[in-house]
């Protein structure tokens, strides 16, 4: 920091400086580095340009020699030179005491040690003042006591004459005031607020940060429907088992619940089996009533069925034996024909069950390759082979009887 040694009084600067007395030698002319009308500024580089004009009246005015030098020592700027104030000889003036270091003045910032102590003391004093204000229940920017005691009431409590102020409350203790301190700094009063009244209390501004938002407690439907995730811990299985034993009784799975489910499934399977057997009996009953006639008489002596697809076979048989005995089967004959022996009775039972479960198969696709058209010589054998009782296959049940 450089000291500005600007002269306090304006002076005339000419090309040739004035003499301060007779017998004195005139100094060499100095360069005029200023514009006309500009004040002269002192400089540590050109001290000869800082000479002041002599006083107008030769009285007790002081003649000063302003030849001073400016140098820097570390963090200090030191100005040296110059003389003390002197008066005329007839009235001596008491001189001022000189500093121990001589006529030297220091400018600039103090040393680092002193600066550190000064900052520490300043911080400590400020902290102490703030804590003292907080202890009294006031913030550093709070209003005065007179303004705090005159708190205006709500708009509904204002009277016609003017504002009705609340009565000042008695002072509370220090620990009670600390509990009532706000968690946010008080807002500054606006410029348009009335100075005689306290500023209105404002709510703190809402921050936009995510950390300040309050989490909602309601769950979404996706969270409700989602299954609970099992907690995966790093503890050994024995420790988890001990922890599970100490839980509530309702937390463990009920084994009787699963046993009840199994019994229910078995019951359903049994009902399905019974219903299927009942359907089987209904189909067999309708087949018997359709195919059987009194005295063991059937439509066809070869197959014994009355199906529309077998009309060709029946017509062929009757054409081959126009004058033969009526188409009747007798159970007292155990002989089998070659055509019927290809399909044993057990196979007929399987076809009968499968055809009435799916209701998709037809007798033409099952029996046509296995039962060839009977010839004239095979007719007696066919009658005796089928005459073992009731037929063993329900493929040619009457469609008019309806579903079982």
From Swiss-Prot:
Basic and acidic residues bias (residue ranges):
98-111, 395-404
Region Disordered, annotated ranges: 1-62, 86-111, 134-251, 317-341, 369-404
What are the alphabetically sorted keywords of the record? DNA-binding, Metal-binding, Transposable element, Zinc, Zinc-finger
Zinc-finger ranges (C2H2-type): 300-321
Q: Where is the composition biased (Polar residues)?
A: 1-11, 29-41, 141-151
Q: Name one GO molecular function term.
A: DNA binding
Superkingdom, taxonomy of origin: Eukaryota
Q: Does the keyword Translocase apply?
A: no
KW tRNA-binding (keyword) present: no
Name listed for the protein in its UniProt record? Retrotransposable element SLACS 45 kDa protein
Q: What species is this protein from?
A: Trypanosoma brucei gambiense
């Amino acid at each position: 920091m450089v000291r500005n040694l600007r002269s306090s009084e304006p002076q005339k600067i000419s090309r040739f400086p004035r003499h301060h007395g007779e017998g004195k030698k005139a100094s060499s002319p100095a360069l005029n580095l200023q514009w006309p009308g500009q004040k002269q500024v002192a400089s540590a580089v050109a001290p000869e340009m800082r000479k002041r004009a002599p006083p107008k009246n030769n009285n007790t005015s002081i003649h000063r020699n302003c030849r001073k030098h400016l140098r820097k020592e570390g963090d200090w700027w030191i100005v040296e030179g110059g003389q003390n104030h002197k008066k005329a000889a007839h009235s001596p003036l008491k001189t001022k005491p000189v500093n121990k270091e001589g006529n030297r003045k220091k400018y600039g910032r103090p040393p680092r040690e002193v600066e550190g102590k000064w900052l520490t003391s300043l911080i400590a004093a400020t902290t102490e003042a703030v804590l003292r204000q907080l202890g009294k229940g006031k913030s550093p920017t709070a209003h005065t006591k007179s303004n705090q005691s005159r708190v205006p009431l709500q708009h509904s409590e204002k009277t016609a004459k003017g504002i009705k102020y609340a009565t000042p409350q008695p002072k509370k203790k220090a620990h009670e005031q600390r509990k009532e301190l706000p968690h946010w700094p008080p807002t500054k009063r606006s410029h348009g607020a009335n100075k005689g009244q306290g500023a209105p209390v404002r709510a703190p501004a809402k921050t936009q940060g995510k950390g300040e938002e309050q989490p909602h407690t309601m769950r979404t439907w996706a969270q409700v429907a989602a299954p609970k995730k099992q907690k995966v811990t790093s503890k050994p299985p024995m420790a988890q088992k001990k922890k599970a034993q100490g839980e509530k009784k309702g937390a463990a799975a009920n084994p009787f619940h699963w046993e009840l489910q199994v019994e229910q499934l078995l019951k359903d399977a049994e009902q399905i089996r019974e219903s299927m057997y009942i359907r089987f009996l209904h189909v067999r009953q309708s087949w018997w009533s359709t195919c059987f006639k009194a005295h063991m008489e059937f439509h066809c002596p070869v197959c014994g069925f009355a199906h529309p697809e077998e009309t060709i076979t029946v017509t062929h048989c009757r054409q081959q034996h126009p004058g033969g005995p009526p188409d009747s089967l007798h159970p007292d004959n155990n002989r089998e024909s070659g055509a019927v022996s290809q399909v044993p009775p057990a196979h007929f039972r399987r076809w009968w069950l499968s055809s009435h479960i799916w209701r998709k198969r037809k007798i033409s696709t099952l029996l046509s390759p296995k039962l060839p058209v009977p010839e004239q010589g095979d007719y007696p054998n066919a009658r005796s082979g089928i005459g073992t009782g009731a037929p063993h296959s329900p493929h040619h049940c009457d469609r008019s009887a309806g579903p079982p």
